[in-house]
Structure formats: C-alpha cells, structure tokens
C-alpha cells in the first residue's frame, strides 16, 4: 500500500517505461512532458511534480499518458470542446510547459491517446446525457479551443452544466454505464442512436 503525506492522495496512474516520456495536462490547459528517467525510483517517497515543472499558481495536473511523437491524442475541456493533437505538437521542452487547449472559464478535462482512426468518443455530462461520435470528426489542431463535442451553451455552462467524462472506445466495444443503482448497456451495433 502507498502512503501519502497529509492532504495528498491517489489521482491517476499511467503505464510508461523508464526510457519513455510522460505527457501531463493541467486543468488550465497547459501540457508538460517529463522524461521518466528523471523521476525518482519507486523505492523512495517520490518527489512532487512541482519540483520538476513550473505549474501556474492554483493549477493542478488532471491527466497523464505515454507520449509518442507519432501518436495522436484527444484533448477536451469541461465546456464540451475538444480536438485531436499530434504527439509532435504535444511535446514541451520547457519546465513551464506549453499552452494546449484554450479553456477560457472552463477547465481542461482529459488527454487520452487515440489508438485508431476507428475509435469513437463517449462524452458524458453532469446532467446524465451521453453522446457517442467518431473521433475522426474532431479537427486536428496544434492548440486552440477545438469543436463542440457535446452541446453546452454559455448559459448552461454558467448554470453549472459540464462535460464530466470522456472515454475513447474501440470500434466494436460494448459500453456499460452505471448511475447509482441503475445500469445501461450500449451495444456496438446500437451506438448510432447516441
């Protein structure tokens, strides 16, 4: 079992080898790249990311994934906007990172590796709505705001409506959603309805 300092806890994990790099996304839309060889070994107590990165005041890391130069990634914010970015455009050489997604008043939500052009995106909002769309419908940008993935107007955003989850689905995968004591299955052949 891992032990944490007071106020700390588990956030996420990512499978990355020591000769690879990790891409991190902060909630303010900035991305950072860390060489795994620079991280302390698992035998110690670790080291705060803030000692290796220059995070802006009040921002926090919300997503991490293996960085590959030839890879493609889906990045999204909780206002429902997102786009596809190439691995080359995601790479940051500096401790201060680079601006990736223009969030405005929103917060960055997700950074996930796209495995195939056939992958689909499942987007969920905090009102319980679900939408499935082909990932290839998103624009490929180096940075910016992107397109609307799930509809959230400025008025709805001001009232608290947010996209709170985004999941990349392989082409023929079934989906099982749970909410409290209810569950809903979406079979691959039924995805067109969503």
Segments predicted by a language model, with ranges:
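Short, structured "edge-of-domain" segments at secondary-structure transitions
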Residues: 1-194
